[in-house]
Amino acid sequence: MVPSAGQLALFALGIVLAACQALENSTSPLSADPPVAAAVVSHFNDCPDSHTQFCFHGTCRFLVQEDKPACVCHSGYVGARCEHADLLAVVAASQKKQAITALVVVSIVALAVLIITCVLIHCCQVRKHCEWCRALICRHEKPSALLKGRTACCHSETVV
C-alpha cells in the first residue's frame, strides 16, 4: 500500500506541529540569556536618567509592566511624587519622641529614688552610729524599747 500525496502532506504537517508543540513546552532557553527564576524577576527597574528628579522626597522606581515611573517616598512624605508632607507621621514621630523622653526621665528619677532608699537602709541598718541616721531612727523610736530593758539606740542608757 503506497501512501497518497494527501496522506504524506498530513503526515508532514503532523511532524511540524509536533515539533512546534515540543518547542513551546521546552524548558531550554531559546536566547543566549541565562534563565531567570520568576522570584528573581523584579517588577521595578531603576528610573532612566530623564526621570532622576521625578520624585520630590523619595526614590524613583520604574514600573516594568506599566512602563511608567513611580516613587518610594521617604518617611514623612506621601503622594504620587512624594510632594506632600505627611502631617500625621510628623505628629506621630513627635509624640513618640516625647513618650521616650518622658520614659527616660521617669526611669532616671525612679533609679535615683531606689539608690537613695538603698543608701538610707544601709546607713540605718548597718551604721547606726551615723549621726544623721541616729537622728532619723530616734525620731521614730517607740518608748516601749526603753521599757523592756533594752538599750536605746539614741542613748546609751539602759532602763531597768
UniProtKB/Swiss-Prot annotation:
Any one Gene Ontology cellular component term annotated for this protein: perinuclear region of cytoplasm
Residue ranges annotated as Cytoplasmic topological domain: 125-160
Keywords: Cell membrane, Disulfide bond, EGF-like domain, Glycoprotein, Growth factor, Lipoprotein, Membrane, Mitogen, Palmitate, Secreted, Signal, Transmembrane, Transmembrane helix
Disulfide bonds: C47-C60, C55-C71, C73-C82
Signal peptide: 1-23
Keyword Lipoprotein: yes
Lipidation positions, renumbered (S-palmitoyl cysteine): C153, C154
Glycosylation sites: N25
Domain EGF-like: 43-83
Gene3D superfamilies noted in UniProt: Laminin
Subunit field text: Interacts with the PDZ domains of MAGI3, SDCBP and SNTA1. The interaction with SDCBP, is required for the targeting to the cell surface. In the endoplasmic reticulum, in its immature form (i.e. with a prosegment and lacking full N-glycosylation), interacts with CNIH. In the Golgi apparatus, may form a complex with CNIH and GORASP2. Interacts (via cytoplasmic C-terminal domain) with NKD2.
Purpose of the protein: TGF alpha is a mitogenic polypeptide that is able to bind to the EGF receptor/EGFR and to act synergistically with TGF beta to promote anchorage-independent cell proliferation in soft agar.
Name used for this protein in its record: Protransforming growth factor alpha
